[in-house]
């Protein structure tokens, strides 16, 4: 399946890390949920959690046998973005490369539109 028409991308690095974390939890029903909440130094912030359920209206994106889930309200702020994973000097983390963000905080955890 091509991701050309998907509103949000799920990178290979993020999918590989999710796959590893799911294996550690020994629960193949887990999916990575990304969501937006109010807060942070720029107005909105990203959240990531593992979830077993997919709610009505949720968008799902699959990569390498794992699923990313986004609720409809959060998706409107994430269209065109990429959920990715990085490991560096500041530690390892999931993050969103979001073209809709007009400003972001220094760590990239919060943004405004």
Swiss-Prot record:
Cystine residue pairs: none
Entry's Gene Ontology cellular component terms: cytosol
UniProt GO MF annotations: 2 iron, 2 sulfur cluster binding; 4 iron, 4 sulfur cluster binding; iron ion binding
Residues binding iron-sulfur cluster: 41, 105, 107
BP GO terms, sorted: iron-sulfur cluster assembly
Entry keyword set: Iron, Iron-sulfur, Metal-binding
Free-text remark on how the cofactor is bound: Binds 1 iron-sulfur cluster per subunit.
Organism of derivation: Vibrio vulnificus (strain CMCP6)
Self-association and partners: Homodimer.
Entry protein name: Iron-sulfur cluster insertion protein ErpA
SUPFAM superfamilies, A to Z: HesB-like domain
Family, per entry: Belongs to the HesB/IscA family.
PANTHER family: IRON-SULFUR CLUSTER ASSEMBLY 2 HOMOLOG, MITOCHONDRIAL
Role description: Required for insertion of 4Fe-4S clusters for at least IspG.
Gene assigned in the entry: erpA
Keyword Cell membrane part of the UniProt annotation: no
Cofactor: iron-sulfur cluster
Signal peptide: none
């Amino acid at each position: 399946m091509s991701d050309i028409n998907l509103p949000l991308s799920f990178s290979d690095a993020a999918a590989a890390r999710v796959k590893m974390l799911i294996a550690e939890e020994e629960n193949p029903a887990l999916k990575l949920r990304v969501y937006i909440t109010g807060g942070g130094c720029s107005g909105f912030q990203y959240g990531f959690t593992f979830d077993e359920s997919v709610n009505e209206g949720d968008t799902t994106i699959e990569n390498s046998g794992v699923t990313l889930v986004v609720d409809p309200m959060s998706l409107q702020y994430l269209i065109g973005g990429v959920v990715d994973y990085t490991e560096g000097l500041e530690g390892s983390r999931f993050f969103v490369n979001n073209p809709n963000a007009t400003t972001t905080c220094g760590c990239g955890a919060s943004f405004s539109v």
